[in-house]
């Protein structure tokens, strides 16, 4: 059925389209934390995230990364390929921050000699637990070869993103990616890339990401607008 709501999430709603292999993604003006325990409507957030994610995915596509992104169709909507989402959050950390610092008792801001890739099991009931490769295989999520691909592709994407953000004076601290299987069974990048699912610090260490909301540091949309404006200056 066309235009049927098929999934509602914390930050996005997904609708069917005339093409069964495509979906329409609508970005919402909602900010959440602690798996939705705290919610707040922030006018303009959805449009900013959609525009930032669209710009990043367009550049990734051009760089040879296979993604679900097709096109931006309005300020807060985009057209995507339909995929079967892999229930893993793939997190890459360039600098210690957030839960990593708390888990291992290290200060925020320590540059990691080698970026660290982590897996989290996408399960709201379990609060998305931190898991390792053996857990991933035990749960039957993906196999050894697919684990290696997810890690390698995430590291490749990191090198591209770090370079782009460095060009506009922003440090890419960490980020979360999601992948899915397309109709041909190929793993491709899905979901989004916005300040909602990464940490971005300017040269002075000021947050330009969702930590502004988490830590009550000021205007979320003002910071997101700066990120968007800077990204638009990239070649």
UniProtKB/Swiss-Prot annotation:
UniProt keyword Ligase, yes or no: yes
This protein's record includes keyword Ligase: yes
InterPro entries for the chain: SAICAR_synt/ADE2_N, SAICAR_synt_PurC, SAICAR_synth, SAICAR_synthetase, SAICAR_synthetase_CS
Enzyme class: ligase
Record pathway: Purine metabolism; IMP biosynthesis via de novo pathway; 5-amino-1-(5-phospho-D-ribosyl)imidazole-4-carboxamide from 5-amino-1-(5-phospho-D-ribosyl)imidazole-4-carboxylate: step 1/2
Catalytic activity: 5-amino-1-(5-phospho-D-ribosyl)imidazole-4-carboxylate + L-aspartate + ATP = (2S)-2-[5-amino-1-(5-phospho-beta-D-ribosyl)imidazole-4-carboxamido]succinate + ADP + phosphate + 2 H(+)
GO terms (BP aspect): 'de novo' IMP biosynthetic process; cobalamin biosynthetic process
Keyword terms, alphabetized: ATP-binding, Ligase, Nucleotide-binding, Purine biosynthesis
Tree of life domain: Bacteria
GO molecular function, one term: ATP binding
The protein's Enzyme Commission number: 6.3.2.6
Gene3D superfamilies: ATP-grasp fold, B domain (3.30.470.20), Phosphorylase Kinase, domain 1 (3.30.200.20)
Family label: Belongs to the SAICAR synthetase family.
Name listed for the protein in its UniProt record: Phosphoribosylaminoimidazole-succinocarboxamide synthase
Organism of provenance: Streptococcus agalactiae serotype Ia (strain ATCC 27591 / A909 / CDC SS700)
């Amino acid at each position: 059925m066309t235009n049927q709501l098929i999934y509602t999430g914390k930050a996005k709603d997904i609708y069917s389209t005339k093409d069964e292999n495509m979906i329409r993604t609508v970005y919402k003006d909602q900010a959440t934390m602690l798996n939705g325990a705290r919610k707040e409507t922030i006018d303009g957030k959805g449009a900013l995230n959609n525009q930032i994610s669209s710009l990043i995915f367009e550049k990734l596509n051009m760089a040879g990364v296979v993604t679900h992104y097709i096109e931006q169709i309005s300020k807060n909507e985009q057209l995507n390929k339909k995929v079967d989402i892999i229930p893993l959050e793939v997190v890459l950390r360039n600098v210690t921050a957030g839960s990593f610092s708390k888990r291992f008792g290290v200060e925020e801001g320590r540059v990691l000699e080698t970026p660290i890739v982590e897996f989290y099991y996408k399960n709201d009931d379990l609060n998305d637990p931190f898991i390792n490769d053996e857990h991933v295989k035990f749960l039957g999520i993906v196999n050894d070869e697919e684990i290696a691909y997810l890690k390698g592709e995430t590291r490749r994407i990191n090198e591209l993103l770090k370079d782009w953000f460095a060009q506009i004076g922003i440090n890419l601290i960490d980020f979360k990616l999601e992948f899915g299987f397309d109709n041909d069974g190929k793993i491709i990048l899905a979901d989004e890339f916005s300040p909602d699912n990464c940490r971005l610090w300017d040269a002075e260490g000021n947050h330009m990401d969702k930590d502004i909301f988490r830590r009550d540091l000021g205007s979320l949309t003002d910071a997101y607008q700066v990120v968007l404006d800077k990204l638009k200056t990239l070649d």
